Amino acid sequence: MSQENLKNTERYFFRASAADFKKIPGSPIAYWASENLFAAFKSKQLRDVADAKQGMATSDNGRFLRLWHEVSIDETCFDCKSLAESECRSEKWYAYNKGGTFRRWFGNNEYVVNWHKNGEELRGFVEEINKLRPGGRLKNQEYYFLENITYSALSSGLFSARYNQSGFLFDTKGSCIFPKTISMNVLFSMLNSNVVQAFLNILCPTLDYSSIGINAIPVKSPDRPVPVKDLLGIAKADWDDYELSWDFSSLPLLHTNHHQPSLHATYKNLRAHSRGVTEKMQCLEQENNQIFIDAYGLQDELDSGVNIQEITLSCNPYYRYGGDKTDAELEAQLQADTIAEFLSYAVGCMFGRYSVDKPGLVLANQGDTLADYLRQVPEPRFMPDEDNVIPLLDGEWFADDVTERFRTFLRVTFGEQHYEDNLAFIEASLGKDVRKYFTKDFYTDHVKRYKKRPIYWLFASPKGTFSALIYLHRYRQDTVSVVLQYLRDFRKKLADELSRQQTIVINPNAEQAKKTKAQKAVEILKKQLLELDDYERDTLYPLATKQVQLNLDDGVKFNYLQLGSALKKITGLEAKED
């Protein structure tokens, strides 16, 4: 090789010594690391100032874990302080950290675990399992319920740390860090900096953020305050703006500080606010990065910039959707989803889970009734459905179906003056009229939003001619009988319509075009009536006679299957729990 060719190829090679690799715990081959990065590993390690611990492995998540919205809120505890306290409390379900997707600062609080009476049932189960397959399944119990920093052990990309106040149990996949001799704020800020990401790229090159790699992170305290309170505050507020947070209060579109005369103007105001929040978060994250870049002396290796896709707020479409969509496509998707969330919240108000007159959950316990609602909201502006069955049909067959109820809800929340404009904005955002959205897309969206553990269930005939929603937490043994009565009422309406269309067909004075149209309607109606007859005879009536009893503690997966083919099938519902 010529001297010139040798010079040209040198730029493709890194020079590093084996002695440098030995400076890093585990001696990984980080050939690209600079001298300053190697030097950082001479500092104290995270294990010297904090404890990084794995949590429990239940060995049967399907039995012991639930998404928090599946069970009664009064049976759920989010603020237990110790194992001793859990021994005395009456609740069955306790906040449980299970890792989750890439999200910094706050969030992914979705699960609860059966820890009734200090985990009596789970401890007994694990004791039996250990006789067959010994193993530490309930690890590090002295750390249960303590304030901590959690992270996802397995990741498809960047590391992310989140704050947990006291009250959580935790999983092997949702490992936690407990500060000892370092400030919680400093450690938390450091872990979410790009400096720590650079260290983890060396320590955990496979993106399996094990406690071994986490414990080896070099630790230095900065010489100036970190902006962690602002970062955490923004992240928590964003998480709590959505129904899947147990601290959800109300829909941002209905917050008084965003409210404008029209829904369109309100959305524009909200979107401007969310842009501002995202930009502020980006500036704060960059400030945080710079603080730790300076602390470690890595100014030549790293810059403080943060890609907009890494600002982990749900109101940020670049993070929420990612991919290669254009700005216009991202904005359209966010607008459509925000309006879909408005419709979802409206359905929650129709069933009494929420109220426009009271923040947070209203009816969220097994067997809750309208009377329970009225005790909490004595003079509601929007009255929930009385019998817990709301028809969801593609025509105006019932005055109280989901579409008509939504129109009332829209008038209550945004007034009569701009009603038509508001409805037009909703339909433009969704790309279809409201009735079509409810009949074609709402349930799919709901199942996805609630992670295949829906709280509103859809009774549906095989081809969807008849469908009706119920709210799981208000289910009673006679609920299926109420659905059956709606089906029979609907069948009668279809039979009457069939007679009307048949009259047109045989009317000698009717125009031929009208006769042709009527004949097509007759053929469709006959098929629909047969479908409804089959659904009643083979499915709904037999189920109604069984008076099936459900227990929310059994979870949506088990309970949904108890009503069998009366409900719309959910693909993947029977998949094994993670």
Predicted regions and their residues:
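Helix N-terminus capping/helix-initiation residues
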Residues: S17, S34, G55, S193, ...
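Structural motif corresponding to the C-terminal cap of alpha-helices
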Residues: V195, P218-S221, A235, Y354, ...
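General structural signal for alpha-helix termini and helix-helix connectors
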Residues: A216-V219, N507
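Basic, amphipathic alpha-helical recognition segments used for DNA target recognition
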Residues: E142, S152-A216, D223-I234
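Terminal accessory regions of large proteins
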Residues: P252, E279-C283, Q290-I293, G297, ...
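Polynucleotide-recognition surfaces of large bacterial nucleic-acid defense/processing enzymes
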Residues: M1-N148, P225-G352, V356-D387
